[in-house]
Amino acid sequence: MSLQIPAQPQLLVRQLGRRPYQPVWDAMKAFTDNRTSDTPDEFWVVEHDPVYTQGQAGKAEHLLAPGDIPVVQSDRGGQVTYHGPGQLVLYVLVDVRRSKLSVRELVTCLETAIINTLAKSDIQAYAKADAPGVYVTNELGMEAKLASLGLRIRKGCSFHGLALNINMDMTPFLRINPCGYAGMAMTQTSALGGPQSVAEAQAILVAELASLIGYQTITNADDTP
C-alpha cells in the first residue's frame, strides 16, 4: 500500500482495560463532538464485557439466539458482531480531514495494520474488497474471519474501529450471522499460532497502524477518556 498521507504530529494511546460497551461508546461520541481542529488523535485499546452490537445496516434476523448476552444498537457502519473478553478492540479517533484520509483509505490502513501484525506470526491473512475485515484460509481451503471493522464519521472525524479475535470464547459467534453472513466461520489468532493474549497483540497492532497513518509522536496513557 502506498497512500500519500501527510505526517501527523501527535497520537495519544489510551489503555482502557476491560469495560462495558455502552460507556465507552458514549465517551467516543462525546470526544468526537467536543474535539477541535487542534485536538490530537487518539487510539483506545479495550476489551469489552460480552455484548452483541448491531451496526446501522444490522438486521434483526441475523441475531439468531442472543440469549443472556445484551444487544446494543450502535451507530457504526456494518452489521451485527460480538465483543467479549480475549478480543482486542481498537477504537480509532482520527481527524480524517486533517489527515487528508478518505474513509476507504482509513479502512485500508486498518486492514493493512492487522495483516502486517499477523504476518509477524507467519499468519497469511488478507482483506476483501466486498466485505471489510481480515480473513484467513485454512488447510482445507475454507475461509474464516478473524477481524471485523466498523466506523462512523462525524464532523470529519472517525470513531469506532476494529475488533481482532485473540484468545476468547468463540461460541457466542454461533448465535449470530457474523457481519450479516449466514454460516460465516470465525477464528482467532491463538488458534493459528499467533498472539495468545490481547497485551501481546495490541503493542504490535498499535505500532503498525500508527506507522501507516504517519504519527510523529506517540504518547501512552492509562487514564479514563
Swiss-Prot record:
Signal peptide range: none
Site-annotated residues for Lowers pKa of active site Cys: 145
EC number: 2.3.1.181
Location(s) in or outside the cell: Cytoplasm
Substrates-to-products reaction catalysed: octanoyl-[ACP] + L-lysyl-[protein] = N(6)-octanoyl-L-lysyl-[protein] + holo-[ACP] + H(+)
Alphabetized UniProt keyword annotations: Acyltransferase, Cytoplasm, Transferase
UniProt-listed CDD domains: LipB
Domain of life of the source: Bacteria
Stored Pfam families: LplA-B_cat (PF21948)
Cellular component, GO annotation: cytoplasm
A single MF term (Gene Ontology): lipoyl(octanoyl) transferase activity
Catalytic class of the enzyme: transferase
Principal subcellular localization: cytoplasm
Active site per database record: 179 (acyl-thioester intermediate)
Domain annotation BPL/LPL catalytic: ranges: 37-217
Gene Ontology annotations of biological process type: protein modification process
Residue positions binding substrate: 76-83, 148-150, 161-163
Pathway it works in: Protein modification; protein lipoylation via endogenous pathway; protein N(6)-(lipoyl)lysine from octanoyl-[acyl-carrier-protein]: step 1/2
Family to which this protein belongs: Belongs to the LipB family.
Function: Catalyzes the transfer of endogenously produced octanoic acid from octanoyl-acyl-carrier-protein onto the lipoyl domains of lipoate-dependent enzymes. Lipoyl-ACP can also act as a substrate although octanoyl-ACP is likely to be the physiological substrate.
More info: In the reaction, the free carboxyl group of octanoic acid is attached via an amide linkage to the epsilon-amino group of a specific lysine residue of lipoyl domains of lipoate-dependent enzymes.
The protein's name: Octanoyltransferase
Organism per entry: Aeromonas salmonicida (strain A449)
